[in-house]
């Protein structure tokens, strides 16, 4: 009976240990994916702002011609 209890305890412990390792790896993967998504969003914002520069320059030149 003690042998069965020890075996069951060992199996449960190892299962819990492997589950915690899997959860940690999953968390790390999600963090990396979130960082990559943040980088993509920053690049999109930079492209959008860079695309607005010619419009701003043309608006300023048009205003300077009027005044």
Swiss-Prot record:
Maturation propeptide residues: 23-48
Compartments where located: Secreted
Pfam families linked: FSAP_sig_propep
Positions of the UniProt region annotated as Disordered: 24-46
Keyword match Acetylation: no
InterPro entries: Frog_antimicrobial_propeptide
GO cellular component: extracellular region
UniProt keyword annotations, A-Z: Amidation, Amphibian defense peptide, Antibiotic, Antimicrobial, Cleavage on pair of basic residues, Cytolysis, Fungicide, Hemolysis, Immunity, Innate immunity, Secreted, Signal
Top-level taxon in the UniProt lineage: Eukaryota
GO terms, biological process: defense response to bacterium; defense response to fungus; innate immune response; killing of cells of another organism
Keyword Lyase set for record: no
List of residues that carry Leucine amide: 66
Acidic residues bias locations: 31-40
Stated family: Belongs to the frog skin active peptide (FSAP) family. Medusin subfamily.
Miscellaneous field: The primary structure of this peptide is identical to that of Phylloseptin-s5 from Agalychnis sauvagei (AC F7UI88).
Protein's name in the database: Medusin-H1
Taxonomic source organism: Pithecopus hypochondrialis (Orange-legged leaf frog)
């Amino acid at each position: 009976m003690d042998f069965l209890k020890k075996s069951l305890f060992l199996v449960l412990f190892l299962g819990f240990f492997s589950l915690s390792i899997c959860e940690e790896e999953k968390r790390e993967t999600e963090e990396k994916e979130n960082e990559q998504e943040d980088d993509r969003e920053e690049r999109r914002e930079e492209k959008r702002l860079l695309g607005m520069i010619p419009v701003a320059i043309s608006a300023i030149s048009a205003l300077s011609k009027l005044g």
